[in-house]
Design a protein with these regions (language model features):
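Short active-site oxyanion
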Residues: 1, 31-35, 63-65, 102-107
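Short, hinge-like loop/turn segments at secondary-structure boundaries
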Residues: 51-56, 84, 124-127
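Active-site neighborhoods of divalent-metal-dependent phosphate/nucleic-acid chemistry enzymes
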Residues: 66-111
Length: 127
């Protein structure tokens, strides 16, 4: 099972949140789980890292596989965005991760479960 870890959990981990560290440890020890992140969410973490965090950030991200954004994912994300933005205020990045999980059968681990209201997407609150 692909475990897509949302950027919020990655950032919490980098900022020293013990609950985020426990979640990542649990997922990495689960033989049925593969650590993944979406390309856009990886970019969010890399683009906004603090200079002092660079080594730790790149080390953390090296444990994850990164799913590319394909035309099919973008098209599905557009449909999610148009459907869910007016009522739930989801942003483009969240729509792309939801479409990525839908396309690959993955689960999304996040603290922001309200960003993923799609009924057919498996979303798990990190802690």
């Amino acid at each position: 099972m692909r475990a897509y870890v949302d950027s919020d959990i990655l950032i919490w981990h980098l900022r020293g949140e013990p609950k985020a560290a426990r979640l990542l440890r649990k997922l990495s020890r689960d033989p049925g789980a593969e650590l993944w992140t979406g390309a856009i969410h990886r970019a969010e973490v890399v683009f906004f890292l603090r200079p002092a965090e660079e080594a730790a950030t790149l080390s953390l991200l090296s444990r994850f596989r990164t799913e590319a954004v394909t035309r099919e994912i973008v098209d599905a994300a557009g449909a999610f965005y148009r459907r869910w933005h007016p009522s739930h205020g989801i942003d483009v990045n969240d729509a792309i991760l939801a479409a990525t999980a839908a396309a690959t059968g993955g689960k999304i681990y996040t603290q922001n479960v309200k960003h993923y209201p799609m009924p057919d997407i498996a979303v798990i609150k990190g802690w």
